[in-house]
Protein backbone atom coordinates (compact mmCIF):
# COMPACT_ATOMS: atom_id res chain seq x y z
CA UNK A 1 0.00 0.00 0.00
CA UNK A 2 3.04 2.27 0.04
CA UNK A 3 2.28 3.40 -3.54
CA UNK A 4 -1.43 3.88 -2.96
CA UNK A 5 -2.67 7.45 -3.60
CA UNK A 6 -4.35 7.26 -0.18
CA UNK A 7 -1.13 6.35 1.67
CA UNK A 8 -0.24 10.05 1.90
CA UNK A 9 -3.16 10.54 4.31
CA UNK A 10 -2.06 7.90 6.84
CA UNK A 11 -1.78 9.15 10.42
CA UNK A 12 1.52 8.10 11.99
CA UNK A 13 2.34 8.37 15.68
CA UNK A 14 5.58 10.17 16.43
CA UNK A 15 5.25 10.38 20.22
CA UNK A 16 2.82 8.06 22.00
CA UNK A 17 0.93 10.01 24.70
CA UNK A 18 -1.92 8.77 26.90
CA UNK A 19 -3.90 11.12 29.15
CA UNK A 20 -6.82 10.03 31.35
CA UNK A 21 -7.38 7.00 29.16
CA UNK A 22 -7.40 9.04 25.93
CA UNK A 23 -4.89 8.76 23.11
CA UNK A 24 -3.46 12.25 22.53
CA UNK A 25 -0.34 11.12 20.70
CA UNK A 26 1.79 13.58 18.75
CA UNK A 27 1.37 12.57 15.11
CA UNK A 28 2.51 13.68 11.67
CA UNK A 29 -0.75 15.64 11.47
CA UNK A 30 0.11 17.42 14.73
CA UNK A 31 3.58 18.38 13.57
CA UNK A 32 2.33 19.83 10.28
CA UNK A 33 -0.38 21.84 12.03
CA UNK A 34 2.27 23.13 14.44
CA UNK A 35 4.61 23.89 11.54
CA UNK A 36 1.84 25.74 9.69
CA UNK A 37 1.21 27.87 12.79
CA UNK A 38 4.92 28.64 13.22
CA UNK A 39 5.31 29.57 9.54
CA UNK A 40 2.25 31.84 9.70
CA UNK A 41 3.49 33.59 12.85
CA UNK A 42 6.97 33.99 11.36
CA UNK A 43 5.56 35.40 8.12
CA UNK A 44 3.50 38.09 9.84
CA UNK A 45 6.24 38.87 12.34
CA UNK A 46 8.72 39.52 9.53
CA UNK A 47 6.09 41.50 7.63
CA UNK A 48 5.11 43.84 10.47
CA UNK A 49 7.93 43.99 13.02
CA UNK A 50 9.57 46.92 11.21
CA UNK A 51 6.70 48.63 9.41
CA UNK A 52 7.60 51.48 7.08
CA UNK A 53 5.71 54.30 5.41
CA UNK A 54 6.81 52.84 2.10
CA UNK A 55 6.04 49.17 2.76
CA UNK A 56 8.15 46.27 1.59
CA UNK A 57 6.70 43.60 -0.68
CA UNK A 58 6.34 41.28 2.31
CA UNK A 59 4.45 43.93 4.27
CA UNK A 60 2.21 44.66 1.28
CA UNK A 61 1.34 40.98 0.87
CA UNK A 62 0.50 40.66 4.58
CA UNK A 63 -1.66 43.79 4.46
CA UNK A 64 -3.53 42.43 1.42
CA UNK A 65 -4.36 39.23 3.32
CA UNK A 66 -5.48 41.18 6.39
CA UNK A 67 -7.63 43.55 4.32
CA UNK A 68 -9.18 40.58 2.50
CA UNK A 69 -10.44 39.13 5.79
CA UNK A 70 -11.49 42.55 7.10
CA UNK A 71 -13.49 43.18 3.90
CA UNK A 72 -15.18 39.78 4.20
CA UNK A 73 -16.40 40.66 7.69
CA UNK A 74 -17.38 44.19 6.71
CA UNK A 75 -19.38 43.07 3.66
CA UNK A 76 -21.19 40.26 5.47
CA UNK A 77 -21.68 41.70 8.97
CA UNK A 78 -20.83 45.38 8.86
CA UNK A 79 -19.11 47.42 11.55
CA UNK A 80 -20.22 44.94 14.23
CA UNK A 81 -18.02 42.31 12.63
CA UNK A 82 -14.74 44.05 13.47
CA UNK A 83 -14.53 42.41 16.89
CA UNK A 84 -14.36 39.01 15.18
CA UNK A 85 -11.34 39.86 13.02
CA UNK A 86 -8.87 37.96 15.30
CA UNK A 87 -10.94 34.76 15.17
CA UNK A 88 -11.78 34.83 11.45
CA UNK A 89 -8.29 35.97 10.45
CA UNK A 90 -6.69 33.17 12.50
CA UNK A 91 -9.00 30.60 10.91
CA UNK A 92 -8.23 31.79 7.39
CA UNK A 93 -4.47 31.90 7.91
CA UNK A 94 -4.30 28.53 9.67
CA UNK A 95 -6.31 26.77 6.94
CA UNK A 96 -4.41 28.56 4.17
CA UNK A 97 -0.98 27.62 5.53
CA UNK A 98 -2.06 24.01 6.22
CA UNK A 99 -3.38 23.74 2.66
CA UNK A 100 -0.28 25.26 1.06
CA UNK A 101 2.11 23.32 3.28
CA UNK A 102 0.45 20.14 2.06
CA UNK A 103 1.54 21.03 -1.48
CA UNK A 104 5.23 20.59 -0.68
CA UNK A 105 6.76 17.20 -1.61
CA UNK A 106 6.62 14.43 1.03
CA UNK A 107 4.53 16.60 3.35
CA UNK A 108 1.18 15.97 5.03
CA UNK A 109 -2.09 17.84 4.49
CA UNK A 110 -3.75 18.18 7.89
CA UNK A 111 -6.89 19.72 6.38
CA UNK A 112 -7.54 16.55 4.36
CA UNK A 113 -8.66 14.86 7.59
CA UNK A 114 -12.25 15.35 8.69
CA UNK A 115 -11.31 15.41 12.39
CA UNK A 116 -9.22 18.55 11.82
CA UNK A 117 -11.74 20.37 9.64
CA UNK A 118 -14.66 19.29 11.85
CA UNK A 119 -12.88 20.72 14.92
CA UNK A 120 -12.50 24.05 13.12
CA UNK A 121 -16.13 23.92 11.99
CA UNK A 122 -17.34 23.14 15.54
CA UNK A 123 -15.35 26.16 16.78
CA UNK A 124 -17.25 28.35 14.31
CA UNK A 125 -20.57 26.67 15.16
CA UNK A 126 -20.15 27.16 18.93
CA UNK A 127 -19.00 30.76 18.46
CA UNK A 128 -22.05 31.56 16.32
CA UNK A 129 -24.43 29.89 18.78
CA UNK A 130 -22.93 31.57 21.85
CA UNK A 131 -22.83 34.99 20.16
CA UNK A 132 -26.45 34.57 19.07
CA UNK A 133 -27.73 33.76 22.56
CA UNK A 134 -25.56 36.39 24.29
CA UNK A 135 -26.69 39.13 21.90
CA UNK A 136 -30.35 38.22 21.48
CA UNK A 137 -31.21 35.84 24.31
CA UNK A 138 -34.10 33.49 23.53
CA UNK A 139 -35.01 35.70 20.57
CA UNK A 140 -32.13 33.97 18.77
CA UNK A 141 -34.46 30.97 18.39
CA UNK A 142 -36.49 33.01 15.88
CA UNK A 143 -33.68 32.15 13.45
CA UNK A 144 -35.39 28.79 13.06
CA UNK A 145 -38.73 30.30 12.07
CA UNK A 146 -38.55 32.58 9.00
CA UNK A 147 -40.59 35.76 9.25
CA UNK A 148 -44.03 35.48 7.69
CA UNK A 149 -44.27 31.69 7.94
CA UNK A 150 -47.93 30.53 8.18
CA UNK A 151 -48.82 29.06 11.58
CA UNK A 152 -49.78 25.68 10.12
CA UNK A 153 -46.37 25.42 8.42
CA UNK A 154 -44.36 26.56 11.48
CA UNK A 155 -43.61 23.09 12.99
CA UNK A 156 -42.23 21.78 9.70
CA UNK A 157 -40.15 24.92 9.07
CA UNK A 158 -38.67 24.80 12.58
CA UNK A 159 -37.56 21.19 12.04
CA UNK A 160 -36.07 22.00 8.61
CA UNK A 161 -34.27 25.15 9.81
CA UNK A 162 -32.96 23.40 12.94
CA UNK A 163 -31.64 20.49 10.87
CA UNK A 164 -30.03 22.93 8.43
CA UNK A 165 -28.40 24.80 11.31
CA UNK A 166 -27.05 21.63 12.94
CA UNK A 167 -25.73 20.41 9.56
CA UNK A 168 -23.57 23.52 9.11
CA UNK A 169 -20.42 22.18 10.80
CA UNK A 170 -20.76 18.89 8.90
CA UNK A 171 -21.05 20.54 5.47
CA UNK A 172 -18.37 23.10 6.32
CA UNK A 173 -15.86 20.45 7.37
CA UNK A 174 -16.68 17.91 4.65
CA UNK A 175 -16.32 20.50 1.87
CA UNK A 176 -12.79 21.43 2.92
CA UNK A 177 -11.56 17.90 3.68
CA UNK A 178 -13.07 16.35 0.54
CA UNK A 179 -11.64 18.98 -1.80
CA UNK A 180 -8.15 18.78 -0.31
CA UNK A 181 -8.15 14.98 -0.39
CA UNK A 182 -9.51 14.76 -3.95
CA UNK A 183 -6.93 17.20 -5.29
CA UNK A 184 -3.99 15.40 -3.69
CA UNK A 185 -5.21 11.98 -4.85
CA UNK A 186 -5.50 13.30 -8.42
CA UNK A 187 -1.97 14.71 -8.31
CA UNK A 188 -0.60 11.46 -6.89
CA UNK A 189 -2.29 9.35 -9.57
CA UNK A 190 -1.17 11.56 -12.46
CA UNK A 191 2.37 11.85 -11.05
CA UNK A 192 2.52 8.06 -10.99
CA UNK A 193 1.78 7.94 -14.73
CA UNK A 194 4.08 10.83 -15.65
CA UNK A 195 7.27 8.76 -15.92
CA UNK A 196 5.55 6.17 -18.13
CA UNK A 197 3.94 8.84 -20.30
CA UNK A 198 7.30 10.56 -20.86
CA UNK A 199 8.49 7.48 -22.76
CA UNK A 200 5.77 7.98 -25.38
CA UNK A 201 4.94 11.69 -25.13
CA UNK A 202 8.43 13.02 -24.35
CA UNK A 203 8.15 16.14 -22.17
CA UNK A 204 4.40 16.75 -22.61
CA UNK A 205 3.43 15.36 -19.16
CA UNK A 206 5.71 17.86 -17.37
CA UNK A 207 3.71 20.98 -18.40
CA UNK A 208 0.55 19.04 -17.51
CA UNK A 209 1.86 18.42 -13.98
CA UNK A 210 2.84 22.08 -13.63
CA UNK A 211 -0.68 23.14 -14.65
CA UNK A 212 -2.26 20.67 -12.21
CA UNK A 213 -0.02 21.83 -9.36
CA UNK A 214 -0.92 25.44 -10.13
CA UNK A 215 -4.60 24.51 -10.14
CA UNK A 216 -4.24 22.67 -6.82
CA UNK A 217 -2.58 25.73 -5.26
CA UNK A 218 -5.53 27.80 -6.49
CA UNK A 219 -7.93 25.27 -4.91
CA UNK A 220 -5.97 25.40 -1.63
CA UNK A 221 -6.38 29.18 -1.48
CA UNK A 222 -10.00 29.03 -2.66
CA UNK A 223 -11.02 26.47 -0.02
CA UNK A 224 -9.54 28.59 2.76
CA UNK A 225 -11.50 31.55 1.39
CA UNK A 226 -14.77 29.58 1.12
CA UNK A 227 -14.47 28.25 4.69
CA UNK A 228 -13.86 31.79 5.94
CA UNK A 229 -16.62 33.49 3.94
CA UNK A 230 -19.16 30.90 5.09
CA UNK A 231 -18.03 31.46 8.68
CA UNK A 232 -18.67 35.19 8.20
CA UNK A 233 -22.14 34.47 6.82
CA UNK A 234 -22.96 32.26 9.81
CA UNK A 235 -21.75 34.98 12.19
CA UNK A 236 -23.98 37.45 10.37
CA UNK A 237 -26.99 35.21 11.08
CA UNK A 238 -26.18 35.34 14.80
CA UNK A 239 -25.52 39.09 14.94
CA UNK A 240 -28.13 40.40 12.51
CA UNK A 241 -31.17 38.17 12.82
CA UNK A 242 -33.23 37.95 9.64
From Swiss-Prot:
It is a multi-pass membrane protein. Keywords: ATP synthesis, Cell inner membrane, Cell membrane, CF(0), Hydrogen ion transport, Ion transport, Membrane, Transmembrane, Transmembrane helix, Transport. InterPro entries: ATP_synth_F0_asu (IPR000568), ATP_synth_F0_asu_AS (IPR023011), ATP_synth_F0_asu_bact/mt (IPR045083), F0_ATP_A_sf (IPR035908). NCBIfam families: ATP_synt_6_or_A, PRK05815.2-4. The keyword Hydrolase does not apply. Key component of the proton channel; it plays a direct role in the translocation of protons across the membrane. It is found in: Cell inner membrane. Its main location: membrane. F-type ATPases have 2 components, CF(1) - the catalytic core - and CF(0) - the membrane proton channel. CF(1) has five subunits: alpha(3), beta(3), gamma(1), delta(1), epsilon(1). CF(0) has three main subunits: a(1), b(2) and c(9-12). The alpha and beta chains form an alternating ring which encloses part of the gamma chain. CF(1) is attached to CF(0) by a central stalk formed by the gamma and epsilon chains, while a peripheral stalk is formed by the delta and b chains. This is ATP synthase subunit a. The chain crosses the membrane at residues 29-49, 84-104, 114-134, 140-160, 189-209, 210-230. GO terms for molecular function: proton-transporting ATP synthase activity, rotational mechanism. SUPFAM superfamilies: F1F0 ATP synthase subunit A (SSF81336). One of its GO terms (cellular component) is plasma membrane. Belongs to the ATPase A chain family.
